[in-house]
């Protein structure tokens, strides 16, 4: 029986369509596989990039994770003067990084704090920070805490109560207006204070006056107020900002972190202990 010409034409069209569909079916997965491979390569690169942020900041190893915070902070007697703290009595192998004034406002330092998860404490002076509070808002958003370092960086010892109270409470009000917080910790400029300072600080809501045992100089060297000339668990380290010469804040922090690692220590959050 002969097939009508029209039927043969329809069969040819159907066969061609099937062949084209088969080719398309084979091509799509290949393209998908190629795309998946590229995505996997990008993911692997990103994983390596984010898994080792410490290398970008000049460290050969990651900082150890700090231990859980203590159940209780340093005791403070209600109604009495706040304690003056140079170092924290703890067996935890932690030291505490504190930064003074607020003169240096390097955006890369914000990146450093975020990527290394550094629980730093920033003691701010209003006249030094000036219009740069936005920088410290960014630092706070990545884990830094904000504390009080007076309005004008005046040496408080010997000043009358009213003057000292104005310096401390005035900065409390500024920080509350800027960040919605009332700092518990206060550092007197230059570390100098007297009984009047403690009374004024208590009246401004301060629960501890924070000094330091170790201080970092502009060249990256450490000096020690008392005790052995090496970092020990519980040490509070002061890192001034805005040094006229020497290393940047980031560079000094890297050197400090290397020394911390050398001593088998890590960085703790001061506010968890004091």
Predicted features along the sequence, with ranges:
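Bacterial signal peptide processing site
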Residues: 24-26
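C-terminal motif of bacterial Sec signal peptides marking the signal peptidase cleavage site
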Residues: 19-22
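Bacterial N-terminal signal peptides that target proteins for export
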Residues: 1-11
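CE4/NodB-like, metal-dependent polysaccharide N-deacetylase domain
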Residues: 114, 119, 145, 154, ...
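Active-site beta->alpha N-cap acidic-glycine motif
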Residues: 57-155, 174
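Acidic-and-aromatic substrate-binding clefts and catalytic sites of carbohydrate-active enzymes
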Residues: 102-105, 123-133, 155-162, 187-193, ...
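His/Asp/Glu-enriched short active-site or ligand-binding loop at hydrolase and phosphoryl-transfer sites
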Residues: 192-231, 265-274
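C-terminal domain-boundary segment and adjacent tail
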Residues: 80-90, 129-130, 247-274
